[in-house]
Amino acid sequence: MIDLKMKNILSLTLLLLASLSAAKTEDALLIIDVRTPAEWDRGHLPNAKHIEWQNIGEEISELTSDKQSTIYVYCRSGNRSAKAKLILEQLGYSNVINAGGLRQAQSFIDSKT
């Protein structure tokens, strides 16, 4: 039996897959890694940008000022990306998707290429 947490993870993964599939090109995607610099240095998704979750409110305007643009955030497990999503939504960004952990996001990107 699938517990509620796993069901939520599956739902978010399916939402991410559908949203990314709708994107015109991979270059059009704004993917932000919100992990620490040390985690970033150990590996990150291709084309991802790096902003630590606690700095996302101050630094997001360097990447986009379009509050309607779709923004994907990820971390190691999905917890910090959930915090980053909340911060961005409080700033008025309306299309923010928590892509969860690095492995989840990487699996999808690999399937596209």
Q: Each predicted region: which residue ranges?
A:
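Hydrophobic h-region of N-terminal signal peptides that target proteins for export
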Residues: 15-22
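Short helix-onset patch at the extreme N-terminus, typifying the N->h transition
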Residues: 11-13
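Rhodanese-like catalytic fold shared by cysteine-dependent sulfurtransferases
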Residues: 2-3, 7-9, 25-30, 37-70, ...
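Short, surface-exposed ligand- or partner-binding patches at beta-edge/loop junctions that are enriched
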Residues: 74
